[in-house]
Regions:
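Recognition helix of helix-turn-helix/homeodomain-like DNA-binding domains
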Residues: 25-40
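Short basic helix-loop element that most often maps to the first helix and adjoining turn
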Residues: 4-23, 48
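Conserved hydrophobic/aromatic packing and binding residues within compact polymer-binding modules
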Residues: 6, 20-21, 31-34, 60
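DNA major-groove recognition helix of helix-turn-helix
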Residues: 35, 53, 61-64
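Helix-turn-helix/winged-helix DNA-binding modules
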Residues: 1, 12, 38-41, 52
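DNA major-groove recognition helix of helix-turn-helix/homeodomain DNA-binding modules
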Residues: 44-59
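Hydrophobic side chains within well-formed alpha-helices
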Residues: 2, 6, 56-57
Length: 65
């Protein structure tokens, strides 16, 4: 599931949820809800995360390794 991939990317880069929330301009609690699947992640945020991690959306959505 892509939510697991987002968490793995964050942890692989030694970042906290607060770090990513700051990057996206949102509260940590909102980002936590994204990672846990309680709130949909806007496409704008997914694109920003993909750029930040240097990966494609296909990679995030596990369409490509």
């Amino acid at each position: 599931m892509y939510l697991r991939r987002l968490r793995d990317l964050r942890e692989d880069h030694d970042l906290t949820q607060t770090d990513i929330a700051n990057l996206l301009g949102i509260k940590q609690t909102v980002y936590s809800r994204y990672e846990r699947g309680y709130q949909n992640i806007p496409l704008e945020h997914l694109l920003k995360l993909a750029d930040h991690y240097g990966v494609t959306l296909d990679y995030i959505f596990e369409r490509k390794d």
